[in-house]
């Protein structure tokens, strides 16, 4: 598996692992901290925005649009696997292609597809770390969503997190 494809699969795993922890916490009678939901909403929204930019379509979501837990599940299902497929199925010519787009502040940019796909996963990882902090501050035990943890689970060296 090439690196970008592995990063796409990791991103799905990390989002699903985080959602499972939020679900189990809520099922145990705890409240999902709003700041954690706010930041994780941004993660999911950014995926939708990058997918739209890569496909030349309008994004269905805004950068800081907020979702409740069921909404996060819905948009994760709509975006995470699509991003994984882009990472997995994009050939060398497409990875080298440049796209022009406008960011949320209206600034125009030109970026290579390989850089965008890498950024999308790194951006999500950065913010999942912030979500973990907000979960801990809200009395929940966060998950370890590090890339190496994904690799260890994938190889059977550690058990999946609950």
Predicted feature locations:
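Helix-adjacent hinge/juxtasegments
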Residues: 58-97
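Mid-chain, well-packed structural core segment of small domains
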Residues: 87-103, 108-113
């Amino acid at each position: 598996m090439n690196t970008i494809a592995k990063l796409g699969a990791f991103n799905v795993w990390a989002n699903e692992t985080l959602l499972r922890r939020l679900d189990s916490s809520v099922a145990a009678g705890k409240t999902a901290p709003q700041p954690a939901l706010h930041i994780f909403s941004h993660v999911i929204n950014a995926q939708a925005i990058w997918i739209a930019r890569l496909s030349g379509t309008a994004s269905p979501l805004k950068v800081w649009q907020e979702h409740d837990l069921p909404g996060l599940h819905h948009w994760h299902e709509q975006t995470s696997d699509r991003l994984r497929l882009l990472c997995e199925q994009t050939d060398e010519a497409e990875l080298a292609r440049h796209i022009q787009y406008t960011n949320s502040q209206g600034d125009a940019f030109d970026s290579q597809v390989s850089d965008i796909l890498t950024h999308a996963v790194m951006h999500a990882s950065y913010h999942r770390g912030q979500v973990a902090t907000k979960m801990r501050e809200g009395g929940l035990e966060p998950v370890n969503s590090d890339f190496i943890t994904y690799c260890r689970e994938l190889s059977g060296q550690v058990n999946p997190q609950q």
